[in-house]
Amino acid sequence: MIPSTRYHGSKRKLLVDLRQSFAGRPIGRALDLYSGSGSVTLLLRLLGWQTDANDYLPYNQNTAALFLGTVAQNLPSTEEVSNELGSLLRARHIEPALVSLHFSGIYFTDQENSEIDSFCQQSAHLTADRRRLYIYLIGQALLMKRPFGLFHRHNLNLRIGAVKRSFGNKTTWDAPILQHALTALTELRRVSWPTNAQGTALCRNTRHGFLEFAQYDLVYLDPPYLGQNGATDYADGYHFLTGLLDYTAFGRFDRRRRHRPILNLPSRWHDPASAAGELIEIEAKWPDAVIVLSYRSDGLLAIADLKALLSRHGRTCQQKTIEYHYTHAQTTTHEIILTSTPPVDMNLDILGATVHDGLAKNNRNDFREL
C-alpha cells in the first residue's frame, strides 16, 4: 500500500494506470523528475526499477530519500516514535523561536507554533535516518492540519474562527500534531519495503537544465499544472515545509505578502512556451529513454501539442485517458498519460519484459488497495 497524502496533484489514485504504463518493459534505471509527493517514486522502486528522484522543493527531496532508503524491518516502533517525537515537540525551545516570532496567527495556533519550533531546534541532533523520518512525519501532520492542505494563505481563522464552513474537517484540523504524525507512521509500516536501499534523491530546479543528471531507461514526468487561471506554484503552496529542514528559513520570509512565504522558486512550468522548451530539452537529454508524462486535459498546454513534442525524432507517442476529479476542482477533468517510445525501443526484449512482469507480480500486494 502506498502511503496517502494531502499533497496536491499527487498521483496516488492513478498508480494502477501508471503501473500499466510502466509494465511490459525490461526493468532498468528510472527517474521521477518532478517527484512531488513521492508516490510514483515508491511505485517504481516497488516494481523493481533502480530509481532516482528529483524535486526542487527540499521537503519533497526528503520524502523521496525516505521512500528510496527505507528497508524492511528498518522503521522504529510506534511506541518508540511516540515517546521520542513527543519529547521533541514538548521540549523547551530556545529563543529566538522563529515560527512563534514570525508566524503567529497565520497557519497554526501559538501552541502548535511552539511545538514546531521545539521540533526544528531539537531534531538537528538526531541521526540522519531518524531526522529524515521525523521531518516526513511532521510535514504530513502539518498538511493534515491545514485548510486545503496548503500554506498559500494567511487563513488560520478558517480553522479556529466561529464561521460557517462548507469544506474541511475541524476535528482533523484540531487533532494534535503527534497524533497525525503517528497516523503517517502507521501508513509507512503497511508498505512491503524491499530489503535493500537504492537510488538517489536530488533537489534540482530543472529550469537550470539537465547536465548533472545521469542516463535512464525510463523518465517519468508529472510537472506542475498550468491551467486557465495560471500556474500551480508549488513553492508558494508548500514553502513552510522547507523550514523543517532549514530552520533559519523561517526568518527569511517575504514581508510584502500576508502569508509570509519563505521560499520563492521560479519554474519553467509557469509559462506554456518555456514549459514546451523544457520538454524539448528533456527529450534531447534522454533520447533513448521511454518518457511517460501525466497531465490534465484542460491545461494551457494542449494535449495535442504535448503529443507533438513527444513524437519528434521518430518517437511513437501513445495516449491513455482517465476520468478523474481533482480535489477543489470545479469540474471533472481527465488525466492524460502519454507514453513516448524511442525508435530503438520498438523491438522490446521479450525476456526482459517477462522478468519485469514477474517482479510486478511479486509486488501485487502493494497495489491491492491504492
Give names to the regions the model predicted.
Residues A64-H125:
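Conserved phosphoryl-transfer catalytic core
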Residues N229-G277:
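Flexible internal linker/loop segments at domain or repeat junctions
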Residues Y107-D233, F250-R260:
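SAM-dependent nucleic-acid methyltransferase catalytic core
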Residues I303-L359:
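Class I S-adenosyl-L-methionine
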Residues L18, A30-L44, A53-P58, E212-D233, ...:
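Conserved proline-anchored active-site loop of SAM-dependent methyltransferases
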Residues N264-G314:
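Conserved Class I SAM-dependent methyltransferase catalytic core
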Residues M1-L31, S39-L47, Q61-T63, T70:
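S-adenosyl-L-methionine
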